[in-house]
Design a protein with these regions (language model features):
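Short juxta-domain linker segments that transition from a proline/glycine-rich
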Residues: 1-352
């Protein structure tokens, strides 16, 4: 039966039953669509094909049997305007995760296993605790104090699925767990694919905090996760080495060089310098006023030296492997990657 998946795909597309009826040119009524979703009726092959086209999903998706559910869904910013918007985002997340797990099954590799780092979850009540927790995690993962070149790849190697989605300018990201009846839960971080690379990296570190910290809920917990992310991406020892332990002033040019080093925003670096008391409150105030004057404090946050978004490469590598080994057809590979078969062949034979 297709009920659950049909409802999920419709919700992900942001359509009501009446909207879908109109999209199908009234090929079937909203009442019939409702019965499909309640598994009281099964559409014929022609209607199934039309539903797939209207919803932008393959027929195989509607006919699939995976029983994934999302748990512990937490949006980084409490700015969802409606239940419809929230349901649409959750449906899109489930669809993306399902594709990921499907290709892992085809290749037979299984998910990279997430295991909690040594000593976690780290209990944090104060900002100093968040600083210590970031250092403990870096130590548990043998990261030293250097900048992490590709945080997305690093987290995927440790079993966290990273999925970019269009979330609109109000939402930076979210975290959740995908629960399946067979197999371990899969931790997931969703980042806004329209954000710059430096903003995505901070979101990843912020959402990682929710996976590894035991912290208060609400605004206090968000503040602690924010400090953890800052300390995890920009260790104090490295900043002290680069800029010293106390500065009367710092130029935008120097902040830009630090942005290139840490792959975080100029503004995040400035706040980190303030947190570590490398610069004082009046210096931070002057910098903040300059950020406002230059328009960096509001979308599109157009700082110089934008960092390219990191791309989750593991999913694509698995798709290429599966088609090369004959585990899936070219059409299935193209479907999973959202490409035409022609474009897939071009990428396989003539990569740029």
């Amino acid at each position: 039966m297709i009920g659950k998946r049909l409802q999920l795909a419709r919700t992900a597309a942001g359509m009501s039953l009446r909207d879908l009826e109109a999209k199908l040119d009234k090929m079937v009524s909203a009442q019939a669509l409702s019965k499909y979703e309640r598994d009281e009726m099964m559409p014929g092959s022609d209607v199934l094909a039309a539903l797939a086209r209207a919803l932008g999903v393959p027929e195989s998706y509607l006919l699939g049997q995976n029983d994934l559910t999302l748990e512990s869904v937490e949006f980084r910013k409490n700015l969802i305007t409606s239940r419809k918007e929230e349901a649409s985002i959750k449906a899109s997340v489930l669809s993306e995760v399902e594709r990921y797990l499907e290709i892992e099954d085809f290749v037979g590799v299984g998910s990279a296993s997430w295991s909690r780092p040594q000593g976690s979850p780290y209990r944090v009540e104060e900002l100093a605790d968040a600083e210590l927790a970031a250092g403990r995690l870096r130590s548990a993962w043998n990261l030293g104090s250097d900048s992490i070149p590709d945080l997305t790849e690093f987290l995927e190697e440790r079993g966290i699925k990273v999925i970019p989605l269009k979330l609109g300018e109000r939402i930076s990201g979210l975290m959740c767990l995908a629960h399946r009846s067979k197999g371990a839960d899969v931790p997931i971080v969703i980042v806004n694919q329209e954000d710059t690379g430096e903003r995505q990296r901070f979101t990843l570190a912020h959402e990682l905090a929710h996976h590894v910290l035991q912290a208060p809920e609400g605004a206090r917990g968000e503040k602690l996760a924010h400090r953890f992310a800052s300390a995890f991406l920009m260790p104090a020892e490295t900043l002290w080495r680069e800029v010293g332990k106390h500065r009367e002033s710092i130029s935008l040019g120097e902040l830009l060089e630090l942005k290139i080093l840490f792959k975080t925003s100029i503004q995040a670096i400035a706040y980190r310098l303030k947190d570590l008391e490398i610069i004082d409150a009046p210096t931070m105030k002057r910098l903040y006023e300059e950020f406002v004057r230059r328009g960096w404090r509001k979308p599109p946050y157009a700082e110089p030296g934008a960092i390219p978004p990191e791309k989750p490469e593991r999913f694509r590598r698995l798709c290429y492997r599966a088609v090369s080994e004959g585990a899936i057809s070219e059409s299935k590979c193209a479907e999973l990657l959202g490409l035409s078969v022609r474009e897939l062949n071009r990428r396989l034979e003539n990569p740029a």
